[in-house]
């Protein structure tokens, strides 16, 4: 039995969907613990592409229970559309469970999100405009609508009549937007409630029961460590906690129940939206990474900013999440490069630093200090073992593992399930490297 958290170790979009899909083969339960439709994951199976935002990656396995936890925020319209999409493809969603205490994104959340971002002007943070921040804000203000409220028609009518009238004042007076019709919204969401009712349960009890029965549970995060509300590049962050600690809060599982944390990183770095990005590449090289990596957001279609691998934020992610091992994705994107650079430290106002600064203003002044490695100039997409990889690619992987001080358990070389090298069992294999007295790692990727 193993209870495993899969987290993003960069700014999101690391390929968590594929890695979670791979690990779901040996999982009995897959749980999404935070975020909403502001994040998407893409899974490619036998040439067929599945793009999901709320439903966990394990949905493609009929014997795997899939749970949307209490730490998420749910847009019922989009969730129902995902359910219908899967049914059209003859994929059952009978094993999908939704937390009754998850909060619900309402139409006024989306309107306020978009209007607020527009009003920020040059201070915009790059929100997706899907209403995620305002939904979490209402949760904190204790004025939010929860899934269990949708299941109570009389209570929902009373709650929404007051809430929508209150939000209409904000929409009209602050943002000069037309008001919402309370009755129209109420009827719309009562309809959503009936569609979702068969899936709604106390998911914390379901997860607790699975733990007691010693089932394998996979906790799936959205976004990434550097987008965490408390530990990311604030204010250019999301409104929840994608870090490993968020899995406990967002599901109702005690921290002593977690056995392992797997971090997912690209072989380079991407970021979407605003905020500092020390290793960002402009010009032809950045465009090459973007094109080869198909770096366009699943949710918004926005072009992602691309740059070299940043080991400073990588080590930070290892520390903040307590990562035991790493899955490295999109190694194949680097196949055409003569040389590859890795950021090993920052120059901050003339001082060398190997630590991630907590201030975004200071982070914006960071200049990368690079180590240059030779490229391999051959395709790796057909490699299925470490022995198949060119020596320069092996050297690159070993260098990253040494910098991160965690073993690399999985190497992904394309979008399909089979384009993967399993270096070590990511569930039961080596954990975070122990250090010798001189500070050098005791166990790392060996080739």
From Swiss-Prot:
EC category: ligase
Its job: Plays an important role in the de novo pathway of purine nucleotide biosynthesis. Catalyzes the first committed step in the biosynthesis of AMP from IMP.
GO cellular component, one term: cytoplasm
Keyword Cytoplasm part of the UniProt annotation: yes
Pathway: Purine metabolism; AMP biosynthesis via de novo pathway; AMP from IMP: step 1/2
Annotated localization: Cytoplasm
Statement: the UniProt record of this protein carries the keyword RNA-binding: no
Active-site residues from the entry: 13, 41
Catalytic reactions of this protein: IMP + L-aspartate + GTP = N(6)-(1,2-dicarboxyethyl)-AMP + GDP + phosphate + 2 H(+)
Binding site for IMP: 13-16, 38-41, 128, 142, 223, 238, 302
Signal peptide: none
Quaternary structure, from the entry: Homodimer.
Organism of provenance: Nostoc punctiforme (strain ATCC 29133 / PCC 73102)
Protein name (database record): Adenylosuccinate synthetase
Cofactor: Mg(2+)
Cofactor: how bound: Binds 1 Mg(2+) ion per subunit.
Gene3D superfamilies assigned: Adenylosuccinate Synthetase, subunit A, domain 1, Adenylosuccinate Synthetase, subunit A, domain 2, Adenylosuccinate Synthetase, subunit A, domain 3
MF terms (GO), sorted A to Z: adenylosuccinate synthase activity; GTP binding; magnesium ion binding
Residues the record lists as binding substrate: 298-304
Binding, GTP: 12-18, 40-42, 304, 330-332, 412-414
Enzyme Commission no: 6.3.4.4
Residues reported to bind Mg(2+): 13, 40
Pfam families for the chain: Adenylsucc_synt
């Amino acid at each position: 039995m193993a209870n495993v958290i899969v987290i993003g170790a960069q700014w999101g979009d690391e390929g968590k969907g594929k890695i979670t899909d791979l690990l779901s083969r040996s999982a009995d339960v897959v749980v999404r613990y935070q975020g909403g439709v502001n994040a998407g994951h893409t899974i490619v199976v036998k040439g067929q592409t599945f793009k999901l935002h709320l439903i966990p990656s394990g949905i493609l396995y009929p014997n795997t229970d899939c749970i949307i936890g209490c730490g998420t925020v749910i847009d019922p319209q989009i969730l129902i559309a995902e359910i219908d999409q899967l049914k059209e493809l003859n994929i059952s969603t009978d094993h999908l469970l939704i937390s009754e205490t998850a909060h619900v994104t309402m139409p006024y959340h989306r309107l306020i999100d978009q209007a607020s971002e527009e009003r920020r002007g040059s201070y915009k943070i790059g929100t997706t405009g899907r209403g995620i921040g305002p939904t979490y804000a209402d949760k904190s203000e204790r004025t939010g609508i929860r899934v269990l409220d949708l299941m109570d028609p009389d209570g929902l009518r009373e709650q929404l009549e007051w809430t929508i009238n209150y939000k209409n004042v904000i929409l009209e007076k602050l943002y000069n937007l037309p008001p919402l019709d309370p009755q129209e919204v109420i009827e719309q969401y009562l309809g959503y409630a009936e569609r979702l009712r068969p899936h709604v349960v106390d998911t914390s009890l379901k997860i607790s029961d699975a733990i007691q029965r010693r089932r394998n549970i996979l906790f799936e995060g959205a976004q990434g460590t550097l987008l965490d509300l408390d530990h990311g590049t604030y204010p250019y962050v999301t409104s929840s906690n994608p870090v490993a600690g968020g899995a406990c809060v967002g599901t109702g599982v005690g921290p002593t129940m977690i056995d392992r944390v797997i971090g997912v990183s690209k072989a380079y770095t991407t970021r979407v939206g605003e905020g500092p990005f020390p290793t960002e590449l402009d010009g032809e090289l950045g465009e090459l990474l973007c094109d080869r990596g198909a770096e366009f957001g699943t949710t918004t279609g926005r072009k992602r900013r691309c740059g070299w691998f940043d080991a400073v934020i990588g080590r930070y992610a290892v520390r903040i999440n307590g990562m035991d091992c790493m899955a490295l994705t999109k190694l194949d994107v680097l196949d055409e490069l003569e040389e590859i650079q890795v950021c090993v430290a920052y120059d901050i106002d003339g001082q060398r630093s190997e630590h991630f600064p907590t201030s975004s203003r200071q982070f914006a002044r960071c200049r990368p200090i690079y180590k240059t490695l030779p490229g391999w100039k051959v395709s790796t997409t057909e490699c299925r073992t470490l022995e198949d990889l060119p020596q320069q690619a092996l050297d690159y992987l070993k260098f990253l593992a040494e910098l991160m001080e965690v073993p690399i358990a999985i190497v992904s070389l394309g979008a399909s399930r089979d384009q993967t090298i399993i270096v070590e069992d990511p569930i039961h294999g080596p954990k975070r490297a122990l250090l010798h007295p001189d500070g050098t790692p005791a166990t790392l990727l060996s080739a």
